[in-house]
């Protein structure tokens, strides 16, 4: 067998490989001998079928299987001998001429093929003990807890019927039935029965709630609005509509007394227990935000200290996934690049940079995990599946079965667990200092954190 490297351009490599016909024929014969004791043919006793006869019957299919196996093993040897880690699947170009193919399968001609690959670069890891990371910490104060309780009370506020003849005001809850039309024609989703609307809540199409002010029970109004340009339905976005609306109930919000009785309506033993629960929830919320900020710092530091050319094909794959998502989101929201004060060309350039960063950081994290034998256990994956199932009450078995039968979905669950374990490993070595900050400071530039690799 002969191997000749024909391309060595950056991370791209290409090889021409020659496998002598004699080597292929020898492996085919060995495979046929192995089959001799297993094949049953009419007219022959078990194990007594001549290899020459087997070759006439099965030679072509065995040769095809042998060549496929030989190509895979040869390629693996080429890559292993040179210490290559592949960024993508190798691109193999086999002979296309039918006569040449038949001669190869018949053992009359050598096999000549090319294999093109893109390799992962050698990554020199930084000294993580030199990393300095600032950990923002927010104490959960009594005022934070009180504000959280107030929000809970507002969300659970009771309403009571207003006096007969009373009109609806901002803050009141009006129960309405309506039928919507566009240019006099009813449309899907435009009809509602006994729908509660809190005036001023902003939960309906802009302008709808405002026009309910002053309405009374039994009164019918024609409410004229326009669907927002970024409305989820393309058929409705930006169009004017009329809703023939009848109020069936007008209720005023009732004062909420935040005490033990209120806490009991929420299933808590007392107000103190409700405050404990609110404090714990806020603590978990702040801890999650702190984790994101620390992780962003760490990823930025890894980006700064690991500069290398990422495999172009991986960058292109990452970019295409991001670009499809961005375009789908913009289309759904009725936005254009001009609305975002940019151009498509500038946006493409920016997202290619982000894709390059994500690929490089992914390779760095993988290298760290591999060199330090960091692994995700089956128990950790199972816990992640269970947590996902809990988020879909009533469909737990469906979720569990989905992940058990879908390796790709399991890999998507495994990836963030692996990344977090690598991050924790680095943080154990880095110099981490805590800094007290306010809630506002903790959540500053939160959007930037969301785009971190």
Swiss-Prot record:
InterPro entries: PPIase_dom_sf (IPR046357), PPIase_FKBP_dom (IPR001179), Trig_fac (IPR005215), Trigger_fac_C (IPR008880), Trigger_fac_C_sf (IPR037041), Trigger_fac_ribosome-bd_bac (IPR008881), Trigger_fac_ribosome-bd_sf (IPR036611), Trigger_fact/SurA_dom_sf (IPR027304). One of its GO terms (cellular component) is cytoplasm. Residues 171-256 form the PPIase FKBP-type domain. The keyword Metal-binding does not apply. It catalyses: [protein]-peptidylproline (omega=180) = [protein]-peptidylproline (omega=0). SUPFAM superfamilies: FKBP-like, Triger factor/SurA peptide-binding domain-like, Trigger factor ribosome-binding domain. One of its GO terms (biological process) is protein unfolding. Its main location: cytoplasm. Keywords: Cell cycle, Cell division, Chaperone, Cytoplasm, Isomerase, Rotamase. GO terms for molecular function: peptidyl-prolyl cis-trans isomerase activity; protein folding chaperone; ribosome binding. Transmembrane segments: none annotated. It is found in: Cytoplasm. Gene3D superfamilies: 3.10.50.40, Trigger factor ribosome-binding domain (3.30.70.1050), Trigger factor, C-terminal domain (1.10.3120.10). Its EC number is 5.2.1.8. PROSITE patterns: FKBP_PPIASE. It is an enzyme of class 5 (isomerase). Pfam families: FKBP_C, Trigger_C, Trigger_N. Belongs to the FKBP-type PPIase family. Tig subfamily. Consists of 3 domains; the N-terminus binds the ribosome, the middle domain has PPIase activity, while the C-terminus has intrinsic chaperone activity on its own. Involved in protein export. Acts as a chaperone by maintaining the newly synthesized protein in an open conformation. Functions as a peptidyl-prolyl cis-trans isomerase. This is Trigger factor. It comes from Rhodopseudomonas palustris (strain BisB5). The gene is tig.
């Amino acid at each position: 067998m002969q191997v000749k490297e024909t391309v060595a351009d950056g991370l791209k490599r290409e090889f021409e490989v020659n496998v002598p016909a004699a080597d292929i024929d020898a492996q085919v014969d060995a495979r046929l001998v192995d089959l001799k004791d297993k094949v049953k043919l009419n007219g022959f006793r078990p194990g007594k079928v001549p290899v020459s006869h087997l070759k006439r019957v099965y030679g072509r299919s065995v040769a095809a299987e042998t060549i496929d196996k030989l190509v895979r093993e040869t390629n693996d040897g080429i890559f292993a001998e040179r210490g290559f880690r592949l960024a993508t699947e190798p691109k193999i170009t086999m002979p296309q001429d039918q006569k040449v193919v038949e001669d190869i399968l018949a053992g009359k001609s050598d096999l000549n093929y090319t294999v093109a690959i893109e390799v992962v670069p050698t990554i020199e890891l930084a000294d993580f003990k030199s990393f300095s990371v600032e950990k923002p910490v927010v104490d959960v104060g009594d005022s934070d807890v009180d504000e959280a309780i107030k929000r809970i009370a507002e969300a659970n506020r009771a309403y009571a019927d207003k006096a007969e003849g009373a009109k609806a005001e901002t803050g009141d809850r009006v129960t309405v039935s309506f039928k919507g039309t566009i240019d006099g024609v009813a449309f899907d989703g435009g009809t509602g029965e006994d729908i509660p609307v809190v005036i001023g809540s902003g939960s309906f199409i802009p302008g709808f709630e405002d026009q309910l002010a002053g309405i009374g029970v039994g009164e019918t109004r024609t409410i004229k609005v326009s669907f927002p340009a970024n409305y989820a339905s393309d058929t409705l976005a930006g169009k004017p509509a009329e809703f023939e609306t009848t109020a069936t109930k007008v209720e005023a919000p009732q004062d909420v007394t935040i005490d033990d009785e209120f806490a009991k309506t929420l299933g808590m033993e007392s107000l103190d227990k409700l405050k404990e629960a609110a404090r714990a929830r806020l603590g978990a919320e702040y801890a999650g935000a702190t984790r994101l900020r620390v992780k962003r710092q760490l990823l930025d530091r890894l980006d700064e200290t690991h500069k290398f050319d990422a495999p172009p094909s991986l960058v292109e794959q990452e970019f295409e996934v991001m670009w499809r998502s961005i375009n789908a989101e913009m289309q759904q929201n009725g936005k254009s690049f001009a609305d975002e004060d940019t151009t498509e060309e500038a946006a493409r350039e920016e997202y290619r940079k982000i894709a390059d960063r994500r690929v490089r950081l992914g390779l760095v994290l993988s290298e760290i995990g591999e060199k330090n034998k960091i692994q995700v256990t089956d128990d950790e994956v199972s816990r992640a599946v269970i947590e996902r199932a809990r988020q879909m009450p009533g469909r737990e078995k469906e979720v569990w079965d989905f992940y058990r039968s879908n390796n790709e979905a399991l890999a998507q669950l495994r990836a963030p667990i692996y990344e977090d374990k690598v991050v924790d490993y680095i943080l154990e070595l880095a110099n981490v200092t805590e800094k007290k900050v306010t809630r506002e400071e903790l959540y500053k530039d939160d959007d930037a954190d969301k785009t971190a690799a």
